[in-house]
């Protein structure tokens, strides 16, 4: 029985993913990639999201309205952004600020108010906000609107398209 337990523990340990390696600068900044995904990236079958700029327009149209996020290049390798999420006639969220990449994350720092910061998932094709956001972000929304869990699929990857994006009131989403 002891041999069976020992063999079972050894097999379970072999099934665990390798821990993220640390370099002299700290933890690895990108998500671990499986061997199959790495092979697909190296063969060119799929793009490496770590090398895809977030500049462009991300938008999802749905029955209640449209959710839009534009990302523009800014100084020092940073970005600026504007977003609007619409949940029907009244509830909506709108804000703008600066953004920066951190591995597979896009850190959105909103201007004004209570200093809302959202760490979004970015995979090259989509920006997905987390299911829970800081209470400081409530000021960005009217009515019962919330940015929790909102996702924005990419529709364009150029700054010109992002600059032309408008909110539902016709104002520029990414302020020049």
Describe every region a protein language model picked out:
Residues 2-7:
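Sec-dependent signal peptide recognition
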Residues 12-14:
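C-terminal motif of bacterial Sec signal peptides marking the signal peptidase cleavage site
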Residues 16-18:
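Bacterial signal peptide processing site
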Residues 23, 77-79, 100-103, 124-125, ...:
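Extracellular/mature segments of secreted proteins
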Residues 31-69, 129-131, 151, 162-175:
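Tryptophan-anchored aromatic micro-motifs
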Residues 51-59, 77-80, 101-109:
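Short, hydrophobic/aromatic-rich segments at coil-to-beta transitions
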Residues 66-101:
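N-terminal glycine/threonine-rich, aromatic-flanked beta-hairpin/loop signature
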Residues 87-137:
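Contiguous, well-ordered beta-strand patches that form the walls/edges
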């Amino acid at each position: 029985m002891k041999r069976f337990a020992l063999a079972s523990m050894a097999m379970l340990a072999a099934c665990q993913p390798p821990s993220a390696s640390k370099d002299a600068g700290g933890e690895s900044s990108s998500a671990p990639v499986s061997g199959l995904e790495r092979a697909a990236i190296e063969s060119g079958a799929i793009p490496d999201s770590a090398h895809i700029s977030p500049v462009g327009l991300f938008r999802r149209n749905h029955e209640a309205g449209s959710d839009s996020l534009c990302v523009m290049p800014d100084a020092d390798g940073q970005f600026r952004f504007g977003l609007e999420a619409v949940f029907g006639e009244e509830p909506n969220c709108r804000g703008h600020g600066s953004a920066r990449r951190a591995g597979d994350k896009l850190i959105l720092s909103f201007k004004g108010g209570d200093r809302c910061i959202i760490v979004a998932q970015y995979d090259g094709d989509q920006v997905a906000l987390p299911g829970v956001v800081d209470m400081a972000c409530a000021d960005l929304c009217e009515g019962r609107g919330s940015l929790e869990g909102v996702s924005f699929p990419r529709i364009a990857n150029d700054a010109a398209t992002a600059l032309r994006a408008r909110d539902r009131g016709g104002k520029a989403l990414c302020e020049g």
